[in-house]
Amino acid sequence: MTDADEDVEAAGDAAIEEPPEPRPIEPAVPEEFGLVQVWWGDGKGKTTAALGMGFRAAGHGYRVHLLQFMKGGTPSVENVRGEYNAIAAMPGFSYETTGHYGWHRRLDDVEDEHAARAESALERARELVDATRDADRDSPIPSDADPEMGVDMLLLDEVLYATNRGLIDPDDLLALIDAKPGDLELVLTGGHERPEYVTDRADLVSEVRKEVHPIDAGQAARKGTEY
């Protein structure tokens, strides 16, 4: 082996480092939260991106809550969506769903029931925003606190899909955005149509665009990737 080969091997070894031991997660107050994020598009990854941010924030000790508008509703959701089990194991991260049994217009639920569930979820979001506004924002929110004590990051998953489908009024969603406290990070996901009504209120707008998707070739949703 030449000196050059040894240098390359040494450089490769040096580039691989053991991860540090995980530290206990202590509740903390975010210093730079308060933006509105919009994730929309016909590609896969909108919910996944929101969940990733949620886990990242919770890893810093921030209180995160996921409210899903168009998902859930099975007798045992923990056996259906892997993220629910992961959230349950993560301090400072919680979730709830609207109890939809599948996607709007795909199963047998009537239109009125879908709209009622979406409106119920929006009312729940209002409650959480109000609770956060009334909370003591100078002190960390305990990781095991009920979300009604306030949250640092609120993920409204598929809320934009619900507005696209006409299940909730876009003006009601705008009112929710206007009512949020300045230090609450609000993440909105869903929908294949650009939500023009909300983009001028957002600090971040990301379009997730599909180029190729296995569903187009007949591949069903896979456990561990789609749920």
Where are these regions (language model features)?
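Hydrophobic anchor at the start of a short beta-strand
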Residues: 64, 186, 205
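Sensor-1/coupling segment of RecA-like P-loop NTPase cores
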Residues: 176-195
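Conserved nucleotide-binding/hydrolysis micro-motifs of P-loop NTPases
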Residues: 71-74, 101-102, 160-161, 192-195, ...
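Conserved P-loop
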Residues: 35-133
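Haloarchaeal acidic low-complexity proteome signature biased toward cell-envelope/secretome components but also
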Residues: 1-33, 137-144, 221, 226
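Phosphate-binding/switch region of NTP-binding enzymes
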Residues: 192-227
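Short beta-strands and strand-loop turn motifs
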Residues: 66-68, 154-159, 189
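Phosphate-binding/switch loop-helix module in NTP-utilizing enzymes
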Residues: 105-182
